[in-house]
Amino acid sequence: MNTFNYPQNLYDIVNEVRLSSQDSISTHYATILQNVLKKYHMWPAMQVKKFYNNNSLVLLHNSYNYNQDDVVGFKQIFDDCRSIVLDMNTDSKEKVVVSYANNIPTRVSIQDYAKNIHETDKYQQAFDGTMITVYNYDDTWYFGTTSCPDVNHSSFYHPTKTHGEMLNEVLMRLFANNFTDEEIHYHDKKDIENKLRTIFTSHLDKQCAYEFVLVHHENKHIIDYSNLLGEGYMTLCHINSKDRVTLEDINIHNQPLSSIGIVYPMNYANINDAYNDMVSSEFSYGFIVAKYPDTGKKLFKISPDSITFKEETDPCKPNIWHNILSVYMKNRKDFTIKDYINIYATDIVLPIDEQGRTMDPTYLVHTMISTLKDVLYNLYVATTTYNPKTNRFKMNKELDSQFPPVIRFHLAQLRLKQQSDQYQHFLRPKDVYQYICKNNNIKNIKLLVNLLATNGGYNISERASVCITVLNNVL
């Protein structure tokens, strides 16, 4: 059990942010919200993003691939906050939530789902792409993604092109007749973007929050739709709308935006229709199951085995080394770094050491992770004492304060792990190793690698130092 009480729901968090804002020197609600999450150790499992043109709005979202063991104490809030835009200035509880995305579909096999079929379950075709959220606040339309408040600053697969640029390309294909050749070739891109999005939102209802899937040939995750949709394919799929006041889903079976070229997923009458369509198409990403228990709508995703395998083994990031690191951190016995390279990265260019020999990726990553483990463990031992009988620790604050923030963050997380996991002993090196691999994302590892690669004083061997320097360059 944890040694402190988590907030019970989203509104408890909002109320604490408001109370804290009255005494805080910070004027940014996003900063205050993040501090509240850190207070309850809900960050970085839950993330905050600020709106640069509106201090009243904040985006609160979960880290969808975070270790579920670390969110047990606030699992309901974690699940509810897939992506929520909050108005921190409103006095009305009913108006706090500006936009709210449904929970991330839980991956299940058709065999497991078959054990729990209910007659009220609904089935919808799934698309492989990026979620785009569109909503109106204070007479201004906002375009974002589930983890970024501005679609123009969001990207994933493509190394340079943003989802905002891809969205504009889709809209230009839909509304090209509204532009002259002169406008397209000589007008400022921002002016064209504003006109495109104004035309698009003229077809939308301000009282609704919309969810679309951006399907684009330069934003492939798992499926290449070229043979189905044509070379250079790009489209928007309208998958959901919510009432801005009640936050209830709106029925879109009448396909209200199909007249302007927006695509809609197929809805299936039953599980057999959904399954048969999935297995009969080589381009099927699967289907979504919506269940309606007493606790609210829950989504599940069922896909062909080939899609499930790729999603479990290929992170699909543009940087191959991010994928290699991710595979290592999953620590699967049946799928290793060598397997990833043999299947997905046969053309990888391996680093060369000072003797002109290629460096094995598994060796590089394992040496780096082991070094991080040694550094964090030694600093933890130096700064922390723990009494297993009382489940309390003492921290050497003077020594701890001398370390860089990134080190102090991980030491604090280890102390939380020491308490919350109810160890009957002081943390061991293998516990720290598991923490690094299971409780961190690629960004956290990159920050540690960069710190060790650019700073001395951590008693790192020459061999390990070479590996860390190489990985700092490729990550």
Language-model features, listed with the residues they occupy:
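Core nucleotide-handling region used for phosphoryl-transfer chemistry
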Residues: N2-L475
